[in-house]
């Protein structure tokens, strides 16, 4: 998926490492406006699912509120739901992600494939997480390491997360390259 920067005519891949929180918020808000203009609850449900981890990194409590707003679709008018959702999305995005909130998201992602990991893969994951918590690597680096795992284990729910799209550094290596190198050394 390539994100177009309409003002500059470039793709986000051209300056992926330079994404600011402002640009992340702008991207999410623009996608929400598309959902709102569609006037379809299905689009809002999809938006909520695709942005779950990104919103979680910003504000976990607002993520819960947004989930309840989406779930109220059988009891309320869509126009009311969209207004409430938009207001709470703005509240959620006002909170800046921290190492702690990103670490929480990473642990949620880990839960998707932890049972399928070998002991060595688990160890490598936790080494990366520790490096991130100790500010030795960036969130972009650790996500670039994890992202290929999503495809290896066919975790389509994670593959569609904007969290990976907006925060990872796609040109980085990954944990499987490290493991392959380790295997060839033995």
Give residue spans per PLM region.
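Acidic, Ser/Pro/Thr-rich low-complexity regulatory regions
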Residues: 2-186
């Amino acid at each position: 998926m390539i994100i177009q920067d309409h003002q500059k005519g470039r793709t986000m891949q051209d300056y992926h490492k330079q994404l600011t929180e402002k640009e992340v918020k702008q991207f999410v808000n623009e996608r929400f406006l598309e959902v709102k203009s569609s006037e379809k609850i299905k689009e809002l449900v999809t938006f909520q699912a695709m942005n779950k981890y990104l919103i979680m990194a910003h504000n976990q409590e607002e993520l819960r509120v947004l989930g309840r707003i989406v779930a109220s679709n059988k009891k309320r008018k869509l126009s009311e739901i969209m207004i409430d959702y938009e207001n709470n999305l703005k509240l959620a995005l006002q909170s800046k992600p921290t190492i702690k909130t990103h670490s929480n998201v990473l642990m949620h992602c880990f839960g998707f494939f932890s049972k399928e990991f070998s002991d060595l893969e688990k160890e490598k994951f936790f080494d990366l997480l520790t490096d991130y918590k100790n500010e030795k690597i960036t969130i972009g680096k650790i996500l670039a390491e994890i992202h290929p795992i999503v495809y290896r284990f066919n975790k389509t729910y994670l593959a569609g997360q904007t969290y990976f799209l907006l925060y990872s550094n796609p040109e980085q290596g990954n944990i499987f390259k490290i493991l392959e190198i380790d295997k060839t050394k033995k």
